[in-house]
Amino acid sequence: MKNFILLAVSSILLVDLFPTHCGHNVDLSKAINLNGVNFNNVDASSLGAAHVGQSASRGRGLGENPDDEEGDAKKKKDGKKAEPKNPRENKLKQPGDRADGQPAGDRADGQPAGDRADGQPAGDRAAGQPAGDRADGQPAGDRADGQPAGDRADGQPAGDRADGQPAGDRAAGQPAGDRAAGQPAGDRADGQPAGDRAAGQPAGDRADGQPAGDRAAGQPAGDRADGQPAGDRAAGQPAGDRAAGQPAGDRAAGQPAGDRAAGQPAGNGAGGQAAGGNAGGGQGQNNEGANAPNEKSVKEYLDKVRATVGTEWTPCSVTCGVGVRVRRRVNAANKKPEDLTLNDLETDVCTMDKCAGIFNVVSNSLGLVILLVLALFN
């Protein structure tokens, strides 16, 4: 019996030493995640269908009384017709406070609207008039006879203006008031489309022959040197506050963006960097960020895999934890292995499983050795 127990424990420890991809030593967190996925993927439609079927199986709607159905069956057998306890009304009640046969209350008999005279569609107006408080035969009140709108002269469509004019307070024959004769807009000289400017100019307050004011002759925009499209910059420059021949200010000569080193397309980056400020030389912004591989570790790993490195990623440099992997750049695909440098490689940070697995292997091995020793010497 003792030997059987030792054999069973030894077998368990041996099985625990198998690789994880063989189905043993499964990570508990992964198992929990799988269980959660299986639970979350349950089709809830089946539950709803079961609930609907249960409701339909009852065979009656809400508010029905099964006792009434039984009573009706008994009365049908007796040949008598049962009367409902609360007979339903087939017609809606009419609105109150009106006379019989009237659609609206507080009005006289035969009238569609109350508080008006007999035979009139609207109250508080004179007989034969569609609208009250106006003269006889007029469609709108408080105006002269034969006029569609009040408070204006005879024969005029709008009041307070001269005869024959469509708009008031202007001279005769003019479409707009307070301007000179024959002009479409006031307060300007004769023959000019806009006022307060010199003759023959499209915009005021500028010199003759200039499209915009307050600038030097022949210049499209003010406050700049002659022949320049934008002000406050050196002659021949398209933008101000920068060195001559530069497209943008506050940067070194030949740079497309300011506050960065020469030859850099993005700010705060080291020389030769196209993306990711504050990155190391030749390195873009990688997947691990703060865990970027240093040059020393890459060199050491390159010396180990120099003969086998190609255009595909190499295995990770570590078996657990954080390491690096490398591959050749496209332009260095045909280069000899002994001539490879760091500039010929692309590097990436790789993260393997936690190193706790190694500790488990060591501890299980020690336990197995102890059990074997006890089994042999007892």
Curated annotation (Swiss-Prot):
Q: List the disulfide bonds.
A: 316-350, 320-355
Similarity comment: family membership: Belongs to the plasmodium circumsporozoite protein family.
This one is known as: Circumsporozoite protein
Q: What does this protein do?
A: Essential sporozoite protein. In the mosquito vector, required for sporozoite development in the oocyst, migration through the vector hemolymph and entry into the vector salivary glands. In the vertebrate host, required for sporozoite migration through the host dermis and infection of host hepatocytes. Binds to highly sulfated heparan sulfate proteoglycans (HSPGs) on the surface of host hepatocytes.
- State the Gene3D superfamilies in the record: Thrombospondin type-1 (TSP1) repeat (2.20.100.10)
Every copy of the TSP type-1 domain together lies at: 304-356
Q: Where is the lipid attached (GPI-anchor amidated cysteine)?
A: 355
**Membrane topology note:** Lipid-anchor; GPI-anchor
Subcellular location, principal: membrane
Sugar attachment sites are 319
The region called Required for the binding to heparan sulfate proteoglycans (HSPGs) on the surface of host hepatocytes is annotated at 80-88
Name where the sequence repeats lie.
Answer: 95-103, 104-112, 113-121, 122-130, 131-139, 140-148, 149-157, 158-166, 167-175, 176-184, 185-193, 194-202, 203-211, 212-220, 221-229, 230-238, 239-247, 248-256, 257-265
Region described as 19 X 9 AA tandem repeats of [PA]-G-D-R-A-[DA]-G-Q-P: 95-265
